[in-house]
């Protein structure tokens, strides 16, 4: 039988009570999913790198970072240098997808690739051997 893992997002957490929020999620989850948005690639802003590091370092669970940012080539490597366990970048935001994925993996992290709803799945086929996960957005 397959094992499924739960990756809840903490996007709606009360950040004034972050340690308690993370502990509450940790009681029933396998990972924490951290959505990082820059208000350029997507029309919302969540966390910058410094705040993300605080969240990552406060967690007893592995952190799965999903970067919805421009310049994902640079950001992917920056986030892979944190204590996050995995980093997912958007195909549409990378200038050199293969190099970025390899850089993430070279830093010992799981590498993921996300695509927007309008991007054909065939766009990521050349990179499947470098991927630990794929995220297909629905919004």
Predicted regions and their residues:
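Conserved N-terminal beta1-alpha1 strand-loop-helix module at the mouth
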Residues: 1-88, 92-96, 102-111, 124-131
């Amino acid at each position: 039988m397959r094992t499924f893992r739960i990756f809840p997002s903490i996007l709606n957490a009360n950040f004034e009570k972050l340690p308690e929020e993370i502990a509450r999620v940790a009681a029933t989850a396998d990972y924490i999913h951290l959505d990082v948005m820059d208000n350029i690639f997507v029309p919302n802003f969540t966390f910058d790198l410094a705040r993300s590091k605080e969240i990552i370092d406060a967690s007893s669970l592995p952190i799965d970072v999903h970067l919805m940012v421009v310049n994902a080539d640079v950001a992917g490597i920056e986030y892979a240098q944190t204590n996050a366990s995995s980093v997912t970048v958007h195909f549409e935001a990378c200038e050199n997808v293969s190099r970025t994925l390899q850089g993430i993996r070279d830093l010992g992290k799981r590498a993921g690739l996300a695509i927007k709803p309008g991007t054909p799945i065939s766009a990521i086929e050349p990179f499947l051997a470098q991927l630990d996960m794929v995220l297909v957005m629905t919004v």
